[in-house]
Amino acid sequence: MLHKKEMRTTSNQKYEITEISHEKYPFLHRIRALRDVSAEVRAGDLGGFVESESNLSFEPDDTAWIFDDAIACNDAYVDKGAVLRGEAVVCDNTYISMGAVLSGHTRAEDNAYIRGAVLSASARASGFSMILNDKDTMGVPILSGHCAVYGKVSGDVRLTGSALVISGEEIRNDTLDTLVISGKNRSVIRDSSRDELAPQQPAPSPPKKQKGCEMSR
């Protein structure tokens, strides 16, 4: 029998690991919020499953959460507002961060790193894959269908169907367009405003030198 006091460190005031074990994997247990975590998670709400506190951040201001029957186990770690929903699974040495959302039957395994991306349906990240949002363009990778990523995907990229990114391959979109990859087909979605012309913005004038401020030689 597991005791709650043995399942929570004194510094974790965000959630506790309950005695409710997973039906198939009894080494996993549901979490319960000890305080209001976000607008969606209130004190007393049950969450998904973890193996230990090492799977989900309990930093005071971190809204990262595991919902429904989702699982985080082994050395997988979820933090910085990322959430798992449905029956999503993150395991092995994966790192899910920066508001990433995994739902449906998605799976992140091996050494996958997912930052700010959205995965749904049966999308999978394996190997040393990296699926990253673009901090400059604010582009977010969106994966769905049965797509699988073993390489690197970044920016506004939509992978769907049976799209496959193999190990060593990089799909990078650092533009304002949306790159769509469905199976072996590739296309681009452009906003009509991208085709409009605008006058060049004048360069800022250099600051004027003030008298008496020049350095003597």
Predicted stretch roles:
Residues 55-195:
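Structural signal for interior beta-strand "rungs" in well-ordered beta-sheet cores
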Residues 1-63, 69, 87, 93, ...:
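Terminal amphipathic alpha-helical/low-complexity segments used for targeting or macromolecular assembly
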